[in-house]
């Protein structure tokens, strides 16, 4: 009985070790599951994100989205109301960001024009500045959707896995800016 228990524990440890090693590809790139935890920076709120290769641009749950002018430039004011996974509390923050661009989203429900802003999120131990459309996702399970543009910056997607990385960013974590990252050549607006 004791030998069986030791063998079972050894097998479980071996499986968990191989799982941890599966987080990087042979080329050393990170491998993410189709659902991951992320932290919205610098706010520090931990959220669930769906990694979706069917979407081009990432999307963030936002309400009260208003485009306005500041010093001759287009800006966007919006509110993010979400549950912080770290505390279990509902939290709310209003942001004002320069409008990066605008997109036309086509789907089964018709067409929708949305502003795009740059937001920072922590994935694993790295902070990424990424493009996000702003949309009311309150009827969705995940407040953050990461599309192909962001996925191409992160690494690989394993659709059979979830929660392969936990956000562990600090003030000294590497920051990858949108302007410094190359977009995949076959993704287009």
What are these language model-derived features?
Residues 7-16:
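Bacterial N-terminal signal peptides
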Residues 1-7:
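Bacterial N-terminal signal peptides that target proteins for export
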Residues 20-189:
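Pepsin/retropepsin-fold aspartyl endopeptidases
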């Amino acid at each position: 009985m004791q030998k069986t228990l030791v063998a079972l524990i050894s097998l479980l440890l071996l499986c968990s070790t191989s799982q941890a090693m599966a987080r990087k590809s042979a080329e050393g790139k990170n491998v993410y599951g189709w659902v991951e935890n992320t932290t919205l920076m610098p706010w520090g709120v931990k959220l669930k994100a769906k990694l979706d290769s069917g979407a081009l641009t990432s999307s963030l749950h936002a309400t009260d989205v208003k485009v306005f002018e500041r010093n001759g430039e287009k800006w966007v004011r919006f509110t993010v109301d979400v549950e912080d996974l770290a505390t279990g509390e509902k939290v709310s923050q209003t942001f004002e960001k320069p409008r990066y661009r605008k997109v036309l989203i086509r789907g089964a429900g018709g067409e929708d024009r949305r502003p795009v802003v740059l937001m920072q999120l922590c994935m694993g131990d790295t902070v990424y500045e990424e493009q996000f459309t702003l949309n009311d996702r309150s009827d969705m399970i995940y407040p953050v959707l990461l599309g192909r543009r962001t996925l191409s910056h992160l690494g690989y997607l394993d659709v059979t896995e979830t929660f392969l990385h936990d956000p562990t960013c600090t003030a000294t974590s590497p920051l990858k800016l949108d302007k410094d990252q190359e977009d995949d050549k076959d993704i287009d607006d």
